[in-house]
């Protein structure tokens, strides 16, 4: 079966495909104004004929960028009367208590675009006041004159009974059939009014833009006589149908980055690495995620933007920490003479100064070029020649001259600050979670990841770095290994020890039925599907929960001794203590439904024996490393010419078509039998 994975990032569009049993790759600049053009060009460069493809897997930053850039649809919000300000007020706590410049999340829809409706349910879903359909109809008729493109509907307690939302949705869609309508129960059947409202608004806000983009992508593929399926990468680490993505685009917020972490998990399993940190550095951002036993952690919530003032999203998402430091991150000097890198990025257009597209702002890639770390003749496998003079001039004018430094000193400062910022992301997923980084391995990928990984690993004492095959397009490869996945949740509150067993059984059965319906809708066979149930538990009086896997409702009833023990162990692991005498409370029941891919050739290829594909070639050049006072003469090797068992001791640079690997003095790199590079770091006593 011929399949391709296409990852559209802020700077580059990457493709990995399996065509007639062979793996092909390509990397091209993203076209911000028309992302589909990048998809078309990546297919052309990889010699992939859409007519011969059975499946396209796709990840994109379009949803999250729409939020970060605040370029979403004009959105209206319908709420229960008396609850108009839930979304605007948010939570009363200050996440950053001592930040004098703290500000709350800015709502994506204005207060005057929030409409109250007469209706009311109690917490059990029983009707207190019927929905006033005439009010909904009157509101619907006023929306076009206000330029509304999308509507979010979030009624109180609709997670327990969606009937009122369903009626409101029917009215809205009948009167304004072209308006994108999101009903909260279709996205999230879970309590927490503010987070549920925020998630619903997010889906509506990005919906029209994502729907139009995916429609354009489908049109292009059909025009090219593509007759296969399109699946989208979702934030929980699985894939979904393109139809589901158009209905639930909020699930695509981290669709590109999580694919790389899925691939890193598969590689860790192949290399028998129990605990590793996936590190992905692209052109716009750098990402890190903790991976245990081949699986990245999944959290039941996420904040888009900064933790303090971003937009809450209460959906499962792979636990990724992201910082605005990538190859295209712009370096700048503030009014006090302080040097900064990012978060603003030069993107694909105009890109770094060395691209020769007219930019005069120095970025991390320009600094790496000045330091001799990048070969200007071999960038993108020779497809783009880099302008060293333009890079040096940008660093000189914007950084070196204002700070009274040499060009090389300024470039080293840019690279050092970028590495320090990225090391914070790695710390956040290791040290901050009680994991000793000295007991982990870093798996580095992304176009710029292998160039900076060793120095970042050294800063926090990670002893080993692994650079996989095709690191520059590794996220696209990860898509080919992702399973179909859908998460379902129901709020179900009760004290462990006195639960209604029949009610718990009924909720689990409803979740299973909903899962089977979604499998059928997406054309996925139930045979081989994995139904995993979880209970969200907490000590009574706590605010947040921990998910504990359950086999059936029987684990929740009686004294539930097994469940209690599992929770205490997990609580101790997460927080360093367990209150063994405290009562437990269940809050939600969950179903995680997955179906593994039938085609495993991408995983098999990652474990295939490596053979050199090009004749041996070696050169040397001067490179400036971190903390180095002067350039160091370094070996330069071409990765496609290396053989399994080859050992290289730094200083060295290993180049390959879509990435560059920097080996610091004294560090030792070995090529595994399957072609992956293992770098063992040396540390001063």
Give the ranges of each region predicted by the language model.
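N-terminal glycine/serine-rich phosphate-binding loop of ATP-dependent small-molecule kinases
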Residues: 1-76, 122, 129-152, 165-170, ...
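Conserved phosphate-binding loops in N-terminal lobes of ATP-dependent enzymes
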Residues: 5, 14, 25, 54-57, ...
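Glycine-rich phosphate-binding loop of actin/hexokinase-like ATP-binding domains
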Residues: 15, 26-31, 76-82, 102-104, ...
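Short beta-strand-loop/turn "lid" adjacent to the catalytic site in phosphate-handling enzymes
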Residues: 19-25, 50-93, 152, 156-165, ...
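Glycine-rich beta-strand-to-loop/alpha-helix junction loops that act as flexible
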Residues: 60, 155-156, 184-186, 235-236, ...
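C-terminal, non-catalytic interaction/recognition modules in large multi-subunit enzymes and RNPs
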Residues: 134-142, 273, 283, 291, ...
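Conserved phosphate-binding/catalytic loops in two-lobed NTP-binding clefts
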Residues: 175-199, 461-477
């Amino acid at each position: 079966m011929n399949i391709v994975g296409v990852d559209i990032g802020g700077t580059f569009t990457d493709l990995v495909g399996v065509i007639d049993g062979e793996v092909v790759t390509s990397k091209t600049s993203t076209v911000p104004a028309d992302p589909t053009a990048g998809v078309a060009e990546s297919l052309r460069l990889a010699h992939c004929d859409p007519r011969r493809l059975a499946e396209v897997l796709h990840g994109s930053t379009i949803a999250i960028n729409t939020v970060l850039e605040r370029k979403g649809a004009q959105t209206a919000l319908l709420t229960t009367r008396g609850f108009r300000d839930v979304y605007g007020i948010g939570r009363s706590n200050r996440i950053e208590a001592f930040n004098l410049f703290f500000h709350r999340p800015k709502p994506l829809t204005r207060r005057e675009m929030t409409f109250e409706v007469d209706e009311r349910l109690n917490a059990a879903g029983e009707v207190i006041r019927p929905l006033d359909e005439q009010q909904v109809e009157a509101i619907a008729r006023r929306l076009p004159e206000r330029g509304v493109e999308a509507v979010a509907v979030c009624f109180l307690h609709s997670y327990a009974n969606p009937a009122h939302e369903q009626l409101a949705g029917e009215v809205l869609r009948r009167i304004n059939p072209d308006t994108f309508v999101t009903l909260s129960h279709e996205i999230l059947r879970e309590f927490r009014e503010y987070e549920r409202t925020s998630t619903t608004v997010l889906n509506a806000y990005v919906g029209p833009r994502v729907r139009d983009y995916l429609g354009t992508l489908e049109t292009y593929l059909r025009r090219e006589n593509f007759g296969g399926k399109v699946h989208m990468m979702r934030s929980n680490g699985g894939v979904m149908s393109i139809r589901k993505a158009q209905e639930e685009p909020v699930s695509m917020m981290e669709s590109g980055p999580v694919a790389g972490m899925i691939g890193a998990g598969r590689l860790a399993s192949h290399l028998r690495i129990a605990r590793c940190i996936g590190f992905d550095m692209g052109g716009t951002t750098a990402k890190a995620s903790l991976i245990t036993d081949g699986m990245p952690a999944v959290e039941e919530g996420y904040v888009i933007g900064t933790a303090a003032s971003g937009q809450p999203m209460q959906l499962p998402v792979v636990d990724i920490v992201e910082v605005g430091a990538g190859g295209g991150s712009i370096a700048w000097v503030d009014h006090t003479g302080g040097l900064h890198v990012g978060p603003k990025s030069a993107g694909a257009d105009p890109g770094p100064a060395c691209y020769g597209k007219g930019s005069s702002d120095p970025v991390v890639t320009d600094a790496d070029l000045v330091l001799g770390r990048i070969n200007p003749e071999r960038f993108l496998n020779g497809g783009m020649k880099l302008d060293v003079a333009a890079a040096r001039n940008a660093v000189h004018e914007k950084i070196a001259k204002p700070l009274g430094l040499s060009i090389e000193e300024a470039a080293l400062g840019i690279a050092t600050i970028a590495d320090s910022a990225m090391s914070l992301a790695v710390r956040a997923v290791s040290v901050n979670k009680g994991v000793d980084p000295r007991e982990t391995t870093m798996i580095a990928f992304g176009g710029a990841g292998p160039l900076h990984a060793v120095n970042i690993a050294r800063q926090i004492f990670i002893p080993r770095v692994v650079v996989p095959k095709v690191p520059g397009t590794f996220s696209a490869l990860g898509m080919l290994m992702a399973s179909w996945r859908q998460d379902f949740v129901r709020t179900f509150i009760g004290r462990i020890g006195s639960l209604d067993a029949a009610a718990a059984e009924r909720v689990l059965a409803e979740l299973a039925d909903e899962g089977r319906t979604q499998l059928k809708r997406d054309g996925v066979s139930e045979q081989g599907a994995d139904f995993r149930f979880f209970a969200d538990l907490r000590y009574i009086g706590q605010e947040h929960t921990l998910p504990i896997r359950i086999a059936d409702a029987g684990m929740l009833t009686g004294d539930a001794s097994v469940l209690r023990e599992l929770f205490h162990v997990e609580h101790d692991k997460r927080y360093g203590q367990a209150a063994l005498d405290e009562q437990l409370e269940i809050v939600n029941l969950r179903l995680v439904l997955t179906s593994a891919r039938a085609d495993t050739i991408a995983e098999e290829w990652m474990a295939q024996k490596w053979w050199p594909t090009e004749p041996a070639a070696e050169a040397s050049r001067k490179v400036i490393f971190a903390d180095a006072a002067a350039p160091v003469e370094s070996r330069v090797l071409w990765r496609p010419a290396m053989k399994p068992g080859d050992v290289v001791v730094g200083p060295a640079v290993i180049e390959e078509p879509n990435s560059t690997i920097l080996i610091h003095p004294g560090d030792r790199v070995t090529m595994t039998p399957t072609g992956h590079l293992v770098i063992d770091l040396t540390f001063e006593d």
